Amino acid sequence: MNISFKNILHTLLLWCITLTLGAQAPPAKQANDNAFNSVSYRPLTPLKVNGEQGVSAPFAGSIYQNLIVAGGCNFPDVPAAKGGTKRFYADIYELPHPDKNPNGQWHKIGELPKALAYGASVTVPQGIVCIGGTPDGKNSCAEVYLLHTDAHHKLQTTPLPALPLALDNMTGAYGGGYIYVAGGLHNGETVNVAFRLRYPHGKTWERLPDFPGRPRVQPASAVQNNATASCFYLVGGFAPANKTERALAHTDGWCFNSATHQWTKMADIIPHGQTEPMTLAGAIGITSGCAHIVFVGGVNKQVFEDAVNRPLLIEQTENNLKLAPTSTLQQQLDQLNKEKAAYMNHPETWYRFNNELVIYHTITDTWVTESQSPLLARAGAAFIQCGHEWIIVNGETQPGIRSSAVTGVKMDMRPTFGWINWTVLIAYLVGMVLLGYYFMRREGDAEDFFKGGGRIPWWAAGISIYATMLSAITYMAYPAKAYATDWTYYPMLVTILIVSFPVIKYYLPFFRRLNVTSAYEYLERRFNATTRLMASGLFIVFMVARMALVLYLPSLALTAVTGIDLYICIVLMALVTIVYCTMGGVEAVVWGDVVQGFILVGGALFAVGYLIWGTEGGLQGFWQIGTEYNKFRLFDWSFDYRSATFWVIILGGMANNLISYTSDQTVIQRYLTTKDEAGARHSILLNGFMSVFVSIVFFAIGAGLFTFFKTHPAELDFTMSKGDTIFPFFMMSQLPQGLAGLLIAAIFAATMSTISSNINSVATAFSVDFYKRFCPQATNQQTLRVARSTCIIAGVLGMGIALLMATWEILSLLDFFQEILGLLSSGLGGLFLMGIFFPRIGGKSALVGFVCGVCMVFLTRYLTDTSFLLYGFIGMFTSVAVAWVCSFFLKEEKNLKGLCWKTIQH
């Protein structure tokens, strides 16, 4: 069968164009309807504490997936409307996991140390932490204890550090390694306090800055990530009336940033598309996904404020009547007294308790409502997280009336990929495999497999370098980073062009003129065999780790938009990539990169246009919103070495890119595929300019994602578990079928270009640096077989680590990748730097410096707060400095002709 490269390329492009032109628009959505999320409700076994009543304001949580409710209060004998007395309980009830025991019943399993209600409770891995509360509605408690079970599954109570201030009617939340409490009453007096306890190792509660504004009683809260850190969000609640101010149901919220230790104001609770603010007094906050908080229940602002302010109005009217009695004032007083008497006797619907899910997004600072249900209309209810289901327990449906209802609420995503998208994606994958098959048939020997026979044009090599270094990390994580923060990472990409000039002048001549196949051959000639083997081995470890990450990213995207299991996606992607790159060698990899590069850039340009066009106000809205929220900020001029400030970005970017472009076999191998040194120079410069100018598109995508979802917050996936999936989510939720499939194929292109290059470079490093060195008599065909076997092994190892990585909590995959780069590769850059520019440094000194540099990076990582962006610079500087000092004590004589910059010039 005669398969030509042009036929493969033309067929692939024809498939994409034809299917894209036949794209189908996504289904129309009603106003404020999210077609990506579905909400379901189910009634569970009621909890009846006294007669038909439940309780309000209990402690609640789960222990070994069983539901636990403790304490609470109600009016058991005479209703509150008739002057009944509130009773507080100490009883602890348990319900077996609803899915494992659908017919399970609540049963009493013990008692609290005393009757309590209106405290805060959070579920931790060890059990349920119960905080504060009141035994009588007057006196506050400071006790904190852990409800848990012993080895015999018997309920136990273990004291924890007490609150510095006794509190009740406050709120509490757990996350980021801390338990937070804020607001409430101290023996009847409202307070603005906030505390946190490091759990489980904290010995005392830390006093946080008081939150701004008036105090809050019965606010809601949650711990959730914002763009950069874990934060405590305090929302709603009410401020009781005092001598100078009326009672106020708060419609705002405040965010405590755990990194900056400061409170910042949240947007007022005005859901998108509405004009009237809401309150969340008596509501509960639930963390959803990686950046959403769902609030359930709570009172109606107008009805509640009228009720709590009515006694004050009556008093004021009575005083006015005494001073100047009029019939109008008397009528007002009569009406107020009538309303007061009738307040407790209306039907449930009159009170208008919140019956919607009120959802806040921490990145865009927006509110939406979703899914009305009468089952949600409760205040003072308890919340229990049970797997992916939210259990809402009891609470009151109107003042004084406690519900016994227990409701399960589940929010799921309903992704659909569609046959057109699948066809586009499969056509692309098949085309790449055919490309590999074509070049496998052209291959002659190991030299072709490793260097492509020197037949690669300089422009193709340049595009290949760009596509290889781009990867899915750039295609997904850079837009996600710009969407969540700003453009402060962009100058790092400019340093690629800056680094290109010293690479061309000082490094390229060594790799081309010494005619090496592996970059680490130079290290043996310059230093010794140990240095070469150690460097090559470390490179292989780094490449396998990198393969795992760039395998994980697109699999994450495919899972987010199709619903296919993440682990299946990883395995599928790995197998396709292994087959493709094992067959065709570096020539297939390079030409595959060229095709993939056009798909990547074309897809990105289209996405930018669509995002700007879809933002309310178009280009003007895009610019205004982006400017207002500092989405285009390029520089942080502070001198904080712990964050992405300008000098950290520049210093770290220069070091990390110098490491990649001077010691990474994946890149250096491209220098060796061109016909001559001039072609290699041109390819490096082309990559540098593409990195500067094309990367603007990816940051514009990030800003566009922010402006689009800022103006369409109801279109977000409220359950999105990884922030890096925001771009592929946009593709699938907003773009027509076919176009979406093509952009998803672009993510696969980014992945395959990087993975195939990594696998090929690992095979080169192992075959040349280890196999051929220890088996010098091996033939070219034997070396080729070893190289292909290494491709398979390396790919499988990368796949295994990617499967493990899927279980980790990583806030930003871009940050994680840069951290791995600094930890594992800084020493390699140092070796090439000292080899070329420091002729007095010998092999022994280089090894000592290398080890010290790696150790310094790990010490910096685990003992300081230094930004991960500086790890590469720290490691490289330390290794060179230590090696240079050691060279005065460990002197070595060696002929360095042609092996360092001084001698190669001659």
Each model region followed by its residue ranges:
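Kelch-like beta-propeller repeat domains
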Residues: L13, P26-T416
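A short, amphipathic alpha-helical segment
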Residues: N2, T407-M411, K631
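Hydrophobic h-region of N-terminal signal peptides that target proteins for export
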Residues: L13-G22
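Generic recognition of cysteine residues
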Residues: C16, C73, C130, C141, ...
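Bacterial N-terminal signal peptides that target proteins for export
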Residues: M1-L12
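Membrane-embedded helix-loop-helix hairpins and adjacent transmembrane boundary segments
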Residues: R414-H906
